[in-house]
């Protein structure tokens, strides 16, 4: 056995046992700045013999590194790198990792003590990992209120339009002149879902009317799920899943959305429910006709959100024709009214109405009120019933003869909407948009949601609550259209109310279309038929009323019957709705890695492809709005004819045809269809910032609200009405105090200021905890500030002074870092007192422990890869070439162990003395289960398919400071001169880096700029020592084509130049990409290597491994002349400018808050009575403002609007 291995067996260290695999095979070839650190870890794993001291071993290692540093990172390019730094890492997180490792080395000798601690902590880990307990009540109390008019503030004109709509509805509702309108109540109809709408009372009828949202365009849920296949082995595969419109599609990754692996039409789903297994509470099942799909989410909260979203989408699909829902109940059929309480702080009116005279079946309707209107409506209905009886109207059923399935004094049963064994289902109302149809046949869609019976003695017709509606009610507003504000004046005339005929539905008689194909058969390709004809098939054109009309003499146009049949098959293949119209079809090849033979479809909305090869199920759905252009290529293969489709922000799509005429016709038709949709493209994509932000906030807040209702035992999705005149706002009813904890440089603090301003706009109080040097900056934005220790300048100075690892550095690090981290932990604990929610940069190290001690929700936020994934390596261990998923995942494991090894001693001591918590370890902390917000664009950092649901890539948190920067006159003259000479202007700046020869680096940049023939805005900050006050100055005279600008606001400068060269910090990279500038990155340390590779991967710039005259000049020419890079950077800039990172982050905080609360663990929980008291206090605080004054409720009874619908759960 090798000597190293035997020595390792004799004396294993605590650090060694925490590692999963031998790191030497992975990290020795790394060229990142942390490579030396990784080498030291690999070597320190093998403890020397008894005669060899630790100090002598470290001296040998230091000598090894000094000798090897000259050849470190060398390749065939032997040209020097003038930008080589004097120290290993300067990014703050990198410094922390390096310093923590140095400190951790001193603990390697304490084997017995370490073994005891490790054994104790591993025994504790099992109890901490139990996540099956119920989540505590969230800190958010959500209210729903009605804003002013959605178009503008409520005016007399808009009120008159609303009254005209009501009059139009009542006129259609009431065919008899003797029926009069009485009252209107804002309420929610409780069925499978809770639907916001209005209840209208007349002297003879009760109506419920609601506008159903059109989820086709504004509803989009994405995330990763596991699809479980097989019943015995239960194999599962992870996919990126997108719920949009009426389809649920599965993809390989978040960047491969044009090639769905599986598409499910929601109209084919008969039910969706959580599985009843207690061992797997994160699974849910989709029933698709006679099949079922089992999906698994990462958490119970995520699974519940997916089920809720799919249910709402299914309901909306059933009402997609009119986007409205109407129920009509004759008052004389009402047999009982009961006011009850289902949800906290709300009133519920249960109405039992006779359904059928022959069977005396009774239906139950539940109307939920949040303004005390339940009793008012009950009294009004009772009064109207008495009037009807006094006037001689016959009450069809004696109230006393109908047995109530649920007594007034009985306790409401717990709801279980996911029990498939119960047949008391709720059947949705059907809206029929047909002027010729006067009756409604029994429906065929079985409800996805079921209720659990409380007693087997109940009749099938008398469920607990809510019971199954045994008939389908025809829509009373068949063609009520939601148009743009300019069309509201004609909205009243479009309302068409139709009569209906009630009927019974027998569950056993429900059947489906026998001719419809199953999901599996749709994905199964047909065998070749008439292969010779298909090989050189002519195009086929299809005429439609709504699409392009081909001339009558067109030889390729199919007749009407074939067109109809082809349209039906086309919609079935790709799960499109009836609005999709096929324009043309072709046979050809999709050329990705290899040519795939199949059929190409062009519709009025999409370009599609379907493989015809046996065993190949490739499909493509490319929206026309994403297509920029198409053009002919001579050929990709001999004998074939090529067509290239240019996609916005995506690589091109290549098609091949065996027939030249087919290729030319496809190009012609494609351009015609693109021209037809081009006029609508701007309308489809142009949404105001306020509208997008509102939609993001609404979706997240609604998810939070549903979770709070679920905590009370009611798993009920909510649908908020899309009223054309009012918009419903869901927002926290109480201001809470957020603590944002971060340490580091100005670039580390800036995103938190942007997030703080967004949270303040939501009505919350925000405090940023960071270094004192940023106080004035933070306070200038009216944000709270608390100072903590941990300024990285001390560590930076320490690293620069020593340059490489040696015994002096180890001794200084052991002393300075220990004091530094102790001060940081203590001040962070003091600063976090009194906050309700903590968001922390993980480099601050203290947050996860403080949140545990304070028992508050905890989030992490960072700018670089910090969570385990196979898609990206850790930002500090980026290899010189891609090495695959195993290596990437291992880098995260390696870094976590290194990082924790260095700080664990101090942290555990601090936990015991200050926080009064027991010791912990990596397993007990569960830091990979913490909700994580990446403030990076998903274009630069696409979410990996193996990211858990609680990991969100939100987009950049830009801080657009409106400071009036006034450039010097000579600066503007320089820029104007460059434009006059038609010279490209580039920005070059690397921050305050420390290099060996700063003068030589300046000379190299000057020569490279001259060779490239561009003008340069230079921001010099490099020097040969840390903190040099003369770093910004240049001793020599600069040529006329270079201007030393110093620090200039990026949001001002980047709009006036053509390209950038910088070090690759997250903030600078985001600013240059948002401006649409080609970017050259010369990384020096930390996450800069990661962003250099990402910018090059997405085609927006160049990553420089070495900076010298030739390499920089070549890169400058490339980014200023290569049209492909320039166009790609511009496209990425347009996409990033449409992102709303702060709004997305706030939405993620809301949506993941319940999950964050469920992770709060402590080894010594508080007494149950204390918990109950805290919960009671929290509930009482729900209607109290931040100042402690009782919130005044706005009464709107009788107003007929929803501006008083407060929901305080």
UniProtKB/Swiss-Prot annotation:
Enzyme class (EC, first level): transferase
PROSITE patterns according to UniProt: PH_DOMAIN (PS50003)
Subcellular location: Cytoplasm; Membrane
Reaction catalyzed: a sterol + UDP-alpha-D-glucose = a sterol 3-beta-D-glucoside + UDP + H(+); ergosterol + UDP-alpha-D-glucose = ergosteryl 3-beta-D-glucoside + UDP + H(+)
CDD domains the record matches: GT1_Gtf-like, PH-GRAM1_AGT26, PH-GRAM2_AGT26
Membrane topology type: Peripheral membrane protein
Domain GRAM: 167-217, 568-634
PH domain sequence ranges: 218-315
Region (Disordered): 1186-1209
GO BP field: carbohydrate metabolic process; lipid glycosylation; sterol biosynthetic process
Major location category of this protein: cytoplasm
Biased composition range(s): Low complexity: 1196-1209
Gene Ontology molecular function, alphabetical: sterol 3-beta-glucosyltransferase activity
Keywords: Cytoplasm, Glycosyltransferase, Lipid biosynthesis, Lipid metabolism, Membrane, Repeat, Steroid biosynthesis, Steroid metabolism, Sterol biosynthesis, Sterol metabolism, Transferase
Family matches, as Gene3D superfamilies: Glycogen Phosphorylase B, Pleckstrin-homology domain (PH domain)/Phosphotyrosine-binding domain (PTB)
Record function comment: Sterol glycosyltransferase responsible for the glycosylation of ergosterol to form ergosterol-glucoside.
Recorded family membership: Belongs to the glycosyltransferase 28 family.
PANTHER family: STEROL 3-BETA-GLUCOSYLTRANSFERASE
Protein's name in the database: Sterol 3-beta-glucosyltransferase
Gene: ATG26
């Amino acid at each position: 056995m090798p000597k190293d291995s035997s020595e390792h067996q004799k004396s294993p260290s605590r650090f060694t046992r925490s590692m999963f695999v031998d790191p030497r095979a992975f990290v020795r070839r790394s060229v990142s700045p942390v490579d030396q650190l990784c080498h030291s870890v690999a070597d320190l794993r093998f403890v020397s013999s008894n005669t060899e001291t630790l100090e002598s071993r470290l001296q040998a290692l230091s000598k090894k590194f000094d000798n090897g540093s000259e050849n470190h990172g060398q390749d065939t390019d032997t040209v020097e790198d003038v930008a080589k730094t004097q120290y290993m890492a300067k990014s703050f997180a990198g410094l922390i990792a390096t310093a923590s490792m140095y400190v951790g080395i001193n603990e390697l000798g304490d084997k017995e003590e370490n073994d005891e601690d490790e054994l104790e902590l591993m025994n504790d880990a099992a109890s901490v990992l139990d996540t099956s307990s119920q989540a505590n009540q969230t800190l958010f109390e959500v209210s729903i209120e009605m804003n002013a008019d959605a178009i503008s503030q409520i005016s007399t004109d808009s009120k008159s339009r609303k009254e005209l709509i009501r009059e139009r509805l009542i006129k259609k509702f009431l065919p008899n002149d003797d029926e009069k309108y009485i009252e209107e109540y804002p309420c929610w109809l409780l069925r499978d879902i809770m639907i916001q709408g209005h209840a209208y009372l007349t002297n003879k009828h009760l109506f419920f009317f609601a506008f159903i949202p059109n989820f086709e365009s504004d509803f989009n849920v994405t995330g990763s799920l596991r699809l479980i296949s097989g019943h015995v082995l239960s194999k599962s595969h992870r996919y990126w899943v997108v719920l949009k419109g009426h389809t649920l599609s599965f993809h390989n990754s978040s960047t491969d959305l044009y090639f769905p692996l599986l598409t499910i039409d929601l109209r084919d789903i008969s039910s969706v429910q959580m599985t009843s297994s207690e061992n797997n509470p994160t699974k849910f099942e989709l029933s698709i006709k006679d099949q079922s799909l089992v999906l698994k989410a990462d958490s119970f909260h995520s699974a519940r959100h997916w089920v809720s979203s799919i249910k709402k989408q299914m309901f909306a699909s059933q009402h997609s024709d009119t986007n409205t829902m109407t129920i009509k109940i004759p008052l004389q059929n009402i047999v009982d009214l009961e006011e009850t309480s289902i949800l906290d702080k709300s009133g519920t009116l249960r109405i039992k109405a006779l359904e059928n005279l022959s069977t005396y079946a009774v239906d139950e309707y539940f109307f939920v009120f949040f303004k005390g209107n339940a009793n008012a409506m009950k009294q009004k209905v009772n009064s109207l019933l008495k009037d009807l009886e006094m006037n001689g109207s016959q009450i069809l059923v004696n109230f006393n003869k109908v047995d109530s399935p649920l007594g007034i004094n009985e306790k409401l049963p717990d709801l279980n909407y996911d029990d498939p064994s119960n047949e008391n289902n709720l059947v949705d109302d059907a809206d029929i948009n047909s002027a010729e149809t006067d009756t409604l046949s029994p429906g065929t869609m079985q409800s996805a949601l079921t209720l659990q019976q409380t007693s087997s003695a109940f009749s099938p017709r008398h469920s607990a609550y809510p019971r199954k509606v045994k008939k389908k009610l025809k829509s009373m507003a068949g063609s009520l259209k939601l148009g743009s504000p300019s069309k509201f004046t004609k909205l009243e005339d479009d309302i068409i109310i139709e009569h209906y005929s009630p009927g019974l539905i027998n569950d056993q008689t429900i059947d489906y279309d026998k001719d419809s194909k199953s999901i599996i058969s749709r994905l199964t390709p047909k065998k070749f038929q008439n292969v010779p004809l298909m090989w050189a098939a002519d195009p086929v054109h299809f005429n439609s009323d709504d699409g392009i009309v081909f001339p009558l003499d067109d030889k390729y146009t199919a007749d009407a019957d074939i067109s109809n049949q082809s349209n039906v098959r086309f919609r079935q293949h790709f799960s499109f709705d009836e609005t999709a119209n096929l324009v043309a079809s072709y046979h050809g090849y999709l050329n990705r890695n290899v040519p795939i033979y199949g059929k190409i479809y062009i519709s009025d909305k999409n370009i599609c492809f379907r493989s015809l090869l046996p065993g190949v199920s490739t499909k493509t759905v490319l929206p026309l709005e994403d297509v920029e252009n198409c053009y002919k290529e001579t050929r990709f293969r001999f004998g074939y004819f090529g067509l290239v489709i240019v996609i916005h922000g995506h690589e091109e799509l290549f098609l091949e045809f065996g027939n030249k005429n087919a290729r030319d016709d496809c190009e012609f038709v494609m351009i015609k269809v693109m021209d037809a949709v081009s006029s609508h493209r701007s309308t489809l994509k142009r949404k105001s910032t306020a509208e997008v932000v509102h939609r993001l906030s609404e979706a997240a807040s609604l998810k939070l609200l549903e979770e709070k209702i679920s905590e009370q035992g009611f798993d009920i999705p909510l649908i908020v009405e899309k009223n054309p005149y009012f918009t419903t706002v869901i927002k926290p009813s109480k201001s809470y105090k957020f603590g944002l904890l971060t340490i580091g440089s100005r670039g580390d603090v800036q995103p938190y200021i942007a997030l703080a301003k967004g949270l303040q706009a939501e009505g919350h109080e925000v405090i940023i905890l960071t270094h004192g040097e940023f106080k004035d900056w933070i306070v200038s934005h009216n944000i709270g500030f608390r100072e903590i220790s941990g300024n990285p300048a001390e560590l930076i100075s320490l690293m620069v002074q020593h340059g490489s690892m040696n015994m002096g550095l180890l001794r200084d690090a052991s002393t300075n870092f220990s004091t530094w981290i102790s001060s940081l932990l203590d001040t962070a604990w003091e600063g976090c007192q009194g906050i309700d929610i903590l968001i922390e940069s993980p480099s601050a190290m203290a947050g996860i422990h403080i949140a545990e001690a304070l028992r508050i929700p905890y989030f992490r936020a960072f700018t670089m890869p910090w969570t385990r994934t196979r898609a990206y390596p850790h930002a500090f261990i980026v290899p010189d070439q891609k090495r695959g998923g195993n290596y990437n995942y291992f880098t995260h494991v390696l870094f976590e162990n290194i990082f924790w090894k260095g700080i664990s001693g101090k942290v555990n001591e601090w936990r015991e003395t200050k926080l009064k918590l027991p010791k912990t370890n990596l397993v007990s902390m569960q830091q990979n289960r913490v909700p994580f917000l990446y403030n990076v664009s998903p274009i630069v950092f696409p979410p990996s398919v193996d990211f858990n649901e609680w990991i969100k890539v939100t987009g950049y948190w830009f801080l657009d400071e409106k400071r009036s920067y006034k450039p010097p006159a000579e600066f503007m003259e320089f820029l104007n001169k460059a434009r006059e000479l038609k010279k490209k202007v580039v920005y070059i700046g690397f921050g305050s880096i420390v290099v060996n020869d700063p003068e030589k680096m300046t000379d190299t940049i000057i020569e490279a700029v001259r060779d490239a023939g561009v003008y340069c805005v230079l921001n010099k900050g490099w020097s040969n020592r840390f903190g040099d006050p003369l770093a910004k100055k240049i001793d020599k005279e600069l040529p006329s084509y270079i201007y030393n600008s110093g620090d200039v606001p990026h949001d001002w400068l980047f709009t006036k130049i053509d390209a950038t060269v910088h070090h690759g910090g997250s903030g600078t990279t985001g600013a240059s990409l948002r401006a649409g500038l080609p970017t050259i990155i010369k990384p020096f340390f930390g996450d800069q290597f990661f962003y250099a590779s990402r910018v090059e991967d997405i085609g927006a710039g160049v990553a420089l491994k070495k900076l010298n005259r030739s390499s920089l000049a070549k890169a400058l020419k490339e980014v200023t002349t290569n049209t492909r890079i320039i166009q790609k950077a511009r496209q990425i800039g347009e996409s990033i400018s449409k992102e709303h990172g702060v709004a997305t982050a706030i939405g993620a905080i809301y949506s993941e808050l319940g999950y964050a609360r469920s992770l709060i663990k402590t080894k010594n929980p508080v007494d149950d009575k204390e918990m109950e008291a805290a919960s009671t206090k929290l509930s009482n605080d729900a209607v109290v403002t931040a100042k402690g004054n009782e919130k005044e409720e706005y009464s709107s009874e009788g107003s007929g609007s929803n501006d008083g619908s407060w929901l305080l759960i």
